[in-house]
């Protein structure tokens, strides 16, 4: 039986989700909300949605499933608004927020006693690109799609959502909302604070030591890439998870103090252990085998300074899920190769390594 799906928010996540739903459920009607006329037009022209509006309340009563792919504050406001609307009996309401406790708490407060079902969710996928124009049906492939069930979630609700989103090819997992926020504070939210703090510190330092900007490359670039993230979104994330974030900051201060004291005392063994333990722990995490935000698989190639060499490599890699290519111009010991190529999945990474190794004499390193 065909359903009507209402996606509120036609940015990268919402528009990509619409494409994924249509892939497995072409008979479903997908309605879209967005304040931006441009985003609505793109989604309609490219067949991501069937109808669009800038009036959130207008389509809500028509939907069998409502998915809020919006900033956290707006998601909370719309949940409160949905509580006062005449919705279909048994409608499923879900979201895509990066923090869950605040959203789930509001849903349980405002939707309790209504003939609706709610399940919090967080698709851990993203890109450096934004907006409906960058929508990608494969955005969620192999990434974790986290559900945070609550008192408003029944077992059949989860099964219906998994069926609806089957075309995303994501990896569904269920976790308590509070535990979700604790985990993501450490592996997602706090790293953004570190990256932005390091970037700001370097900018101030470079005012007196101007060569710092010129020499910043390799490891520095890797550590600060996420400092380019959208400020409004991250302000909202931190303020909706403030207690856990503050715990992470306090814990990290202690670790900095410990290594600082070791340096001050000249404790070579403690310093060595600091780096060695971190190296061993990172290797044990098998980060590339996990779905997650901006998950990618990187390959480095030492290529000669010859005409068309990059074009030759790209020809070899035709048909792979190449998502980014970067030329490392700096001659630094922490740069594995001149050409850095990122792939969406491990299969294409392995295929690329084999193709380049078999057809060239270039040195290839997988990071």
Predicted features and spans:
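A conserved regulatory-domain signal marking ACT and ACT-like small-molecule sensing domains
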Residues: 281-367
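Rossmann-like NAD(P)-binding element
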Residues: 57-86, 91-92, 98
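Internal alpha-helical scaffold of NAD(P)-dependent oxidoreductase catalytic cores
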Residues: 139-226
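Rossmann-like NAD(P)(H) cofactor-binding subdomain of soluble oxidoreductases
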Residues: 81-132
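Interdomain hinge/lid region at the active-site interface
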Residues: 208-275
